[in-house]
Amino acid sequence: MSSPSLVELKAILRLAGPLIAAQLAYVAMVFTDTVMMGKLGPDALAAGGLGAVSYAFVSTFCVGVVAAVGNLVAIRHGCDDAAGAAAAARSGLWVGAALALAAGLLLWNLRPLLLVFGQAPQTVDGAMQFLHSLTFALPGYMAFMVLRGFTSAIDRAGPVMAISVLGALANLALNYSFIEGLFGLPRLGLAGIGLVTALVMNCMPLLLALYIRLQPAYAEYSLLRGLGRPQRAMVEEILRLGLPIGGTYAVESGMFTVATLCMGIIGDHALAAHQIAIQAVYVAFMVPVGLSYATTYRIGQHFGAGRLLEARRAGRVGIGFGALCMLLFAGLFWWMPEAIIGLFLDRDAPANREVAAMAVSLLAIAAWFELFDGTQNVAMGAIRGLKDARTTFLVGLACYWLVGVPLACLLAFAAGWGAAGVWWGLAGGLACAAIGLTLAFEWKTARLLPKATASEASALNCRAAGRGAPSARLCPGNAPVPPTAAAD
């Protein structure tokens, strides 16, 4: 690997390491909630699972929208525009609050929709009990994701990791205390699990905000000044970039929801095997998710500074390293499927043998699945670093719903492949996305490179403007930062 590429890899890994750890901490929180639901019995597990899936689908879209904040902060950081970066974070908090309110109202009143989809009334009752507590996690979750994007985009992801791990540990301790009624605490059941998650989720952004406020390294980023005056232009910019990102997250999540429904049609054993295999895939997938965020921020910094050649190099390094990591996980899925399934299920129990055997066969397909999924996710992040989310949405929509879903249904039912057919269909859609998004990144950078000289000149002008410049400033690839924002 050439020296410039090695520099980019080190920079991406410095960001990706803490972000991967933060993602795994979130997985640990979800796993803890699931285990605690299981302690309450199968009925509570079914109801809690229904509520958790509903919450995850809605919150995933919201997270996608506020993910745009990190993109914009990285671009302005590359342009040495601290005031613009702070303005993006402040506006992101307003967008996150609005999304939390809208999503909360939707989840609070979800009961009629769940009944329309044929869910058992008693299961819906339990799910709503869980959701009525969990809904209050949304404001904190959105605020944390905004602040996480802000601090990571300026190359300070360490506190995100520390607070995420602390949150996961607090979630475990409090959940266990409420479930077991320790220290005189009441046993609150599903409502208690949702309440604990909401409490932890709202404490995490407060801790991160306090850290940002007290650390001298953030002195030039004034997040409080002007927080009460949302900037319409910046809010619109976040939504222009964020809505397609949220849409991409939603259509991908929808594809996996369809896969789960297909497994339910095939049979209970197929559904159980699918859930076990998807958990293994989900844990491994946190690596490319962290790499994707890191690649987005690194490219955004180069893009903001007008360094298009370096942006392309960072994208290629990120995509290549993501594929390599997933190839290693693929090797584990090929060579050690029984051991991996054993982490989730007692394979020796007679009642589990059929499910375990089916899950092992799905992991063999998951090896290809992971390689494609990891590559497409990092490529998606690379394109977003160039402030383009529309391309990722269109490619994702086409590959997930015009290739992945039809192919899964065709192979599972028409071809008679059953559960394996569903997973090969998903792998086909993800392979299409991996190829399409990688080519889209190359096409995008090839179009931008002729403008590199002009971009560099613009970046120099941006720096020359300085903090005291009374006029609006323009960073490459950005809308102008209003003079009021610069004054903040």
UniProtKB/Swiss-Prot annotation:
The membrane spanning regions, by residue number, are 11-31, 55-75, 97-117, 127-147, 159-179, 190-210, 247-267, 271-291, 317-337, 355-375, 393-413, 421-441
Q: Which UniProt keywords apply?
A: Antiport, Cell inner membrane, Cell membrane, Ion transport, Membrane, Transmembrane, Transmembrane helix, Transport
Q: Where in the cell is it found?
A: Cell inner membrane
Q: Which GO terms describe its molecular function?
A: antiporter activity; transmembrane transporter activity; xenobiotic transmembrane transporter activity
Chief subcellular location equals membrane
Membrane topology of the entry: Multi-pass membrane protein
Q: Which GO terms describe its cellular component?
A: membrane; periplasmic side of plasma membrane; plasma membrane
Give the record's family classification: Belongs to the multi antimicrobial extrusion (MATE) (TC 2.A.66.1) family.
Function description: Multidrug efflux pump.
Q: What NCBIfam families does this protein map onto?
A: matE, PRK00187.1
| Protein name as annotated | Probable multidrug resistance protein NorM
Organism (species): Pseudomonas aeruginosa (strain ATCC 15692 / DSM 22644 / CIP 104116 / JCM 14847 / LMG 12228 / 1C / PRS 101 / PAO1)
At the highest ranks, the source species' classification is: Bacteria, Pseudomonadati, Pseudomonadota, Gammaproteobacteria, Pseudomonadales
